[in-house]
Every structure is written in structure tokens, then in C-alpha cells.
Amino acid sequence: MPTAFVLLNTEIGAESEVVKALKEVEGVETAYNLWGVYDIIASVKADSIDKLTHIINKQIQEIDKVHSKLTMIISETGTPPT
């Protein structure tokens, strides 16, 4: 199942509002406030890569007060080789 981590920058003071909105988006599994360069991290899963990119580029990016995002799509799942 395609999965991505999305780092978001928001309008100052809007972090909790954006986290609440993220939790309403289908496919968003978790969303947390951060301290540092980015304001929020979210984990997103979908049935296909097309659906995943739609969620990120349309639903998440268009949340009010989201200024920018950095998306990291996981290339494979499972345990690392030993």
C-alpha cells in the first residue's frame, strides 16, 4: 500500500487547526505538530500511487493555511536487509 510522510509549513499559529483538518482527510493516518523547520508531519496511505498523490496534492495542499509541503514517498516496505 503506497505510503508517504508529508512535512508541512503553515501560517503562524494555525498548526492545531491544520492538524485537525488533516485528521478529517481520508488516508491520513497520523498528524503531529513539530518543533523545527516544519510545523507538522503527517503519514498518508492509499490504495494506489495515483490516489496517494491526489490526497497530497489536492486535499492536503488545499487545506486553508498550508503554505508549503515536502513529500517523502516510501519506496518499499518491510525489514531492511541484514
Question: What is each stretch, according to the model?
Answer:
Residues 1-82:
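A compositional/biophysical signature of low hydrophobicity enriched in polar/charged and small residues
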